[in-house]
Amino acid sequence: MSMEPPVGLTAMPVTKLAMITTLVVPLVASIASYKHIFLLQYDPFLQTYHQYYRLLIFQFCAINESDTVILALIWYLFRHLERLLGSHKYLTLIVLSWAYTTLGIWGLNLIWNAFIGQYKWLQWNNFSTGSLPIVLSLVHFYKEYTPQIYEWNIRLLGPRGGASSHNDNKREDKSAVEWKINDQFLLNGLILLLILNQGFAGILCGFISWMCGIFIDKGLLPGLDHWRIPFVSYFISQGPPTRANVAIAANAATNTAAARATVEAATAATGNGNTGNSGPTSLPLRGSSTTPTNTSSAGDDEPGADEPARPLGVQFLDTFRR
């Protein structure tokens, strides 16, 4: 399997759904002036008003527009995971991450405020907005199962004097700062920006969610190995085949060893039927000549004498290539 995923989201229905949800829900909520229902705080929404439904929906909409754009880019980079796990398992992983991160953040929030948050200045009041918990849970899977393709080094040197000598060069080499950066640098930068945009709540919720991802992968939080979301296989399928998909599938089938073996067997059967003296006459392959060829007199000088009969699909493609 190639390390580089295909361009676009044609074969990535779950990634497409996640990106559309991340972009459309904040837009519709902003137009309808309902963005405030996705804001989650311990006081007053949970402690005073007991609006626990906010725990179920606070990850579906980012309050800040910058977080919305960053989350959409991160979902696009996560298409590696959908290609690796498959659409159905990837969707199950997202749902499990949503459930476990919500329960984990809420439970630790209650414990924190029950013992430490009695003092107002130590109370954990704000939660993260948007799908930051789900994304931080999936970061573990991305780091664990996505190989690094390339890396490069960046050296930062101090200011150089007017006259440099050999000793000065040695001193500069010792004082140089070298950074090693790999191809996951873009994802790391986006994750860092997303966490810093949300302050202390982003750091705390992000760490809890990252730990939830580790526990899901190690099997401490069950569900990923033995359970799949029911009744969604039809909706996450690729849909009706397009002209490009049919052409790619036909070309791949022609190039397989099984297809070549079938063509050779059919060619051999046709040759035996033409040279035999008894028995029924075998029908020629489509595209081959019905006139028997005298191979003994033709010899090897005739071009295409040893060329096997071409299937109909190959002839059809050759017609348009000419």
UniProtKB/Swiss-Prot annotation:
Keyword presence, Methyltransferase: no
Region annotation (Disordered) ranges: 269-322
Compositionally biased residues, Polar residues: 287-298
Subcellular location field: Membrane
Chain ranges on the Extracellular side, renumbered to this chain: 1-19, 76-90, 142-189
Membrane topology category: Multi-pass membrane protein
Keywords of the record: Membrane, Transmembrane, Transmembrane helix
Gene Ontology CC terms, in alphabetical order: Dsc E3 ubiquitin ligase complex; endoplasmic reticulum; Golgi membrane
Residue intervals passing through the bilayer: 20-40, 55-75, 91-111, 121-141, 190-210
Chain ranges on the Cytoplasmic side, renumbered to this chain: 41-54, 112-120, 211-322
Principal cellular location given in the protein's record: membrane
Superkingdom of the organism of origin: Eukaryota
GO process terms (BP): protein ubiquitination; ubiquitin-dependent protein catabolic process
The keyword Transmembrane is assigned to this record: yes
Subunit structure: Component of the DSC E3 ligase complexes composed of at least TUL1, DSC2, DSC3, UBX3, CDC48 as well as VLD1 for the vacuole-localized complex or GLD1 for the Golgi/endosome-localized complex.
Biological role: Component of the DSC E3 ubiquitin ligase complexes that tags proteins present in Golgi, endosome and vacuole membranes and function in protein homeostasis under non-stress conditions and support a role in protein quality control.
Protein name: DSC E3 ubiquitin ligase complex subunit 2
Encoding gene (name): DSC2
